[in-house]
Amino acid sequence: MQGFKIARHFELPTAPSQFFAGSSLNRLSFLRSNREFLNKAFYDHTTRFLPFCDLNPALLVKDDKLVTLSYPQISKYFTFSPFEHTDKQIAERFSKGESLPVLVYMGNEERNGPTDNWSQHNVFAIDITGIDELQQSIRDNGGTFVNLRSIFTEQYQLSASDSGACAFARSILDWISRYRFCPGCGKRNIPTMGGTKLVCSDVLLNDDSNCPSKKGINNYQYPRTDPCVIMVILSHDMQHILLGRALRHPKGLYACLAGFLEPGESLEEAVVRETYEESGVDVEKVLYYASQPWPFPQSLMLACFGIARKNAKIQRDKDLELEDVRFFSREEVLRSLEWDAKDGPAPILFPPKLSIARNLIQAFAYDDWTNSQVKM
């Protein structure tokens, strides 16, 4: 990236708040190992439990609100409190055939503002997959289990706080379901720390266990987040935008280029590499814009703007993941963004309004991604 000088300091505006990133809960991560606190929260009459079935949250469709349950509504499914026992005691009971619904401590609502008293108004997620009776009760009371992708596409009007809570809960529940058994030795894992850590039952039950997880911190013992870059690449004169069309996209839909970061790679390097591999376009400047949690299953979208080198040309002879890649003018993008649906399909279709991809495209179209200009 040599030969590039910034004439003036970039003043990136505050990016709009992203869907899935608006939870108002105080996660209280420092209390996740406090069994006494979690046990009191579990039984407290003000605690809310958010039910999930097959990773889908329960929604009161008429109100666009999440279904919440109280302890009396779930108590019959808990033969014992998961927080009144040590991890070893729970492993012993599970080894004898007992089981419990998976719980994830999500945080405190802090309804009256920041506080040091978190004894009330706590929130858990509860996985009720397989508990048909409770699922039916929720449906009988106006609830329905909704695929989170449907919520994302604006079919429902979920609040920012609820969307953030759903993203957190779904990601953790998905992680727990994928790692029911220890990758190190194959024995059953036991959720602990409010559902945010997994401990191998063999380690808990056998002092002479040879499980690799006993020998240090492993990436399967804690939830992971996979970083992805998603970028709007601008032409050198910053008047055109590079978008691609994936084979799986509906006809006419163009979106930002994107891809996972690889080990030993910086954010900027990933933007340059992914753009080159998918389009052949060389990028000489990368600017971070915003991020969006993406709970499918546990990704974090890192949105960036990139500036293409002068006279950069599209060459699609490397990664053929995309069906088409092209530069669009600001006028073309604006025309499609402001298209009246009554006139039929827009010339260019874009990702849903709640996506960070759409926010990036709009930031370019309305020229509000920077308050100054760059000279090459």
Curated annotation (Swiss-Prot):
GO cellular component entries: cytosol; nucleus; peroxisome
Cofactor: Mg(2+); Zn(2+)
Positions of the Nudix hydrolase domain: 223-351
GO molecular function, one term: NAD+ diphosphatase activity
Binding-site residues for substrate, renumbered to this chain: 222, 258-260, 274, 278, 321
Top-level taxon: Eukaryota
Binding site for Zn(2+): 182, 185, 200, 211
Cofactor descriptive note: Binds 3 Mg(2+) ions per subunit.
Residues involved in Mg(2+) 3 binding: 274, 278, 321
PANTHER family: NAD-CAPPED RNA HYDROLASE NUDT12, NUDIX HYDROLASE, NUDC SUBFAMILY
Protein name per its UniProtKB record: NAD-capped RNA hydrolase
Annotated organism of origin: Schizosaccharomyces pombe (strain 972 / ATCC 24843) (Fission yeast)
